[in-house]
Every structure is written in C-alpha cells, then in structure tokens.
Amino acid sequence: MQMSEIETKRLLIRGTRESDGPACLEIWLDDEMGKYMADPPKDKADDAELNFAVGIENQDGWYPMVVFHKITGDFLGTCSIVPMDDGKRWDFGYAVHKKYWRQGYATEILQKLIELGKEKGVKVFSANVAKENVASNAVLKKLGFSVWKDTGSYRKRGTDIIYSEYTYRLEI
C-alpha cells in the first residue's frame, strides 16, 4: 500500500517504489547498518530478498517508505508502518543510513509517523528492537515508548545469529 508524501522540517517521506530497491538494500544488507535487522548479510540474501521492491507499490498490509533530505534530496533511510489489531496499533520499522547517524533523523521520522497516526485515530504504537541496539533503544525511550515485552528474539536470516529483543509500546 502507498502512503501520501509526508514532510517534516528536514525530511520528505514517501512510499517505496521499485526504483528505491538498491538504496534500501544498501542499508539493510550492510554488515554495520543492517547489523540488528532480520535481513541477511548481502552474501546470504536470496533472490526474493534482493528483488523485494518488485511490485512493492501494490503490496497490501503495510506501508513501506523511504526518507530523503528535503533540501539536498539525499537518501537517508527507510521506515514502515504495519497496522496491527485491526488498525488500532501501528508497528514501526526504521533504518537510517550511517552517514546520517546521530543527527536526530530517526527521532524526526518516528515523531512524524506518530503524529500521522494520532491524526488517523491510532492510539497505540509499537516497535521491536534488538536489546543490543543501543541507539534505537535510546530513540524509542526518548519518544516516550516503554518496554512492553522483553521475552522475544529473532534470528538474522542466513546466519546463526539470534538477537534478544524488546517490544516497545507507546499509548496515547
């Protein structure tokens, strides 16, 4: 499903297009940037993962988006909304390119998605984060999220790496 373009002070967020695939994969399959993502390392990615963007504009059940700097047009990262509980809760995913780490972009992205959700009547937001991912844990806490569940885990596809995770929740 496609989301309308969203703007923040510094960012333009829009629905992912097939042509965005290579930029997304640069983050997700990178050893450093994708370290805590479930996506496999580049050398372990299969054809389905490498071609994830084919037909993405027509997929249902979630809103995959890409993020650009409004002034420079630089690709900054990705984010997504997955409506849960009949749309009463939005689950977020996000990734920022390492060139833009520690500049407040993840916070700005999530602030805007929360604002959009509130406008649409969503009252609960969530996100799953590896316990080891210090930066993402800090972003969610800064935005008022608290740990809802701390018993989950996931395996990084194509590897034997298993991460323990927190599920964060924010109720408005």
Region roles according to the model:
Residues 1-35, 66-172:
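Acyl-donor (CoA/ACP) binding surface of acyl/acetyltransferases
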Residues 32-54:
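Conserved GNAT-fold acetyl-CoA-binding loop/helix
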Residues 53-66:
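A short helix-loop-beta-strand connector motif used in the catalytic cores of GNAT acetyltransferases and
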